[in-house]
Design a protein with these regions (language model features):
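Short, glycine-rich nucleotide/cofactor-binding loops
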Residues: 2-13, 184, 215-218, 245-246
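N-terminal basic/disordered segments at the start of proteins
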Residues: 3-34
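Short beta-strand segments
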Residues: 8, 33, 74-76, 176-177, ...
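Short glycine-/acidic-enriched loop or helix-start segments at secondary-structure transitions
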Residues: 17-18, 41, 83-85
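Conserved mixed alpha/beta catalytic, RNA-binding, or beta-rich assembly cores of soluble enzyme
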Residues: 22, 51, 104-108, 124-229, ...
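N-terminal glycine-rich phosphate/adenylate-binding segment common to multiple enzyme folds
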Residues: 57-131
Length: 247
C-alpha cells in the first residue's frame, strides 16, 4: 500500500495542484481545509476530505493519525491576521499550549513549532514545492513588455529591500517607486500591501522574494491572479520575484 499524504490546505488552487501531483506519484491523499473558502475542487480531488478550523490543532493532529498519514504538506493562503481579527480562529487547548510556549508570534516561530509537533508524531513535513516545480518560473522577463531602465532600477532596489524584511521575518513583499519604499508587507498580507503602496506611487514596482533562510516546508512566496488584480487596481507597473523560489 502506498504512502498517505496529508494536505493542510489554505485558500487558492495550490492545494488542488498538490493533491493531483501527489496522486500521480502514487500517494493516497487526505486534504484538511483549515479556513473557509478553500477551492471547491479540493474535496472532489482528494481521496479523503475534512474541514477542520485551523485553531483546532488537537483535532487536526488526531485526524492525521486516524487517517494513517505518513507525510504532510502545508499549502495555500492562510493570512496570519486570523490570529487577531477574531471570528475565524477558535483555538483549542493544544493550540493555546503551543502559542503560549512561543517567545514571539513571528511566522517562522509558529510554523517551526507546528513542524516540530508533527515530526514528534512521526509525520514527516514535506517540501511545499515537491509537486509544484512546474509553477516555479526561472530567470527572465515573463511579460510581453520589457521593464524601462527606471523600472529595472526599482526592481533591483525592491528585491534587495524585500530580502532584508524577509530576514527580519516581517514579510516577503515591498512596493517601491523611484528607489523609495511605498509599502512593506506585514500581517495584512501581500494584496493589502500592494493596494496601499500602489496608490501612494502610481507606476510602482512590487518585489516579492523568499526569505534569506527560507524553509521550503512552509510559507514559500506565491504570486497569483489575485496578486495581478491588486497590482492593476492600484496602478503598479510591474513585479519582480525570485527565480526558482516563487510559486
Amino acid at each position: 500500500m502506498g504512502k498517505t499524504l496529508g494536505v493542510l490546505s489554505g485558500v487558492g488552487h495550490l492545494p488542488v495542484d498538490v493533491v493531483r501531483g501527489a496522486k500521480k506519484a502514487g500517494y493516497r491523499t487526505v486534504a484538511i481545509a483549515l479556513v473557509p473558502g478553500t477551492h471547491e475542487d479540493l474535496e472532489k480531488e482528494a481521496d479523503v476530505f475534512h474541514a477542520i478550523n485551523i485553531g483546532k490543532v488537537g483535532k487536526i493532529f488526531k485526524t492525521l493519525k486516524q487517517e494513517g498519514v505518513d507525510e504532510v504538506t502545508m499549502i495555500g493562503k492562510v493570512t496570519k491576521e486570523i490570529l487577531y481579527s477574531g471570528g475565524i480562529l477558535v483555538p483549542d487547548w493544544q493550540a493555546i499550549k503551543i502559542l503560549m510556549s512561543l517567545p514571539d508570534r513571528h511566522d517562522d516561530t509558529i510554523m517551526n513549532a507546528l513542524v516540530a509537533k508533527l515530526e514528534d508524531m512521526g509525520i514527516h513535513v514535506m517540501d511545499q514545492t515537491l509537486f509544484l516545480t512546474d509553477l516555479m518560473p526561472q530567470e527572465g522577463v515573463l511579460s510581453k513588455r520589457q521593464p524601462t531602465p527606471e523600472e529595472w532600477e526599482d526592481m533591483k532596489y525592491g528585491f534587495a529591500m524585500a530580502k532584508k524584511i524577509g530576514g527580519l521575518d516581517i514579510g516577503q513583499t515591498v512596493v517601491v517607486k523611484n528607489k523609495a519604499i511605498m509599502a512593506v508587507e506585514a500581517i495584512e498580507g501581500t494584496d493589502a500591501c500592494i493596494l496601499r503602496g500602489g496608490k501612494l506611487g502610481k507606476g510602482a514596482i512590487v518585489a516579492k522574494t523568499a526569505k534569506p533562510a527560507q524553509d521550503n516546508r512552509f510559507d514559500m512566496p506565491g504570486v497569483g491572479v489575485k496578486t495581478m488584480e491588486s497590482m492593476i487596481e492600484s496602478g503598479c507597473a510591474g513585479i519582480v520575484m525570485e527565480a526558482g523560489r516563487t510559486l
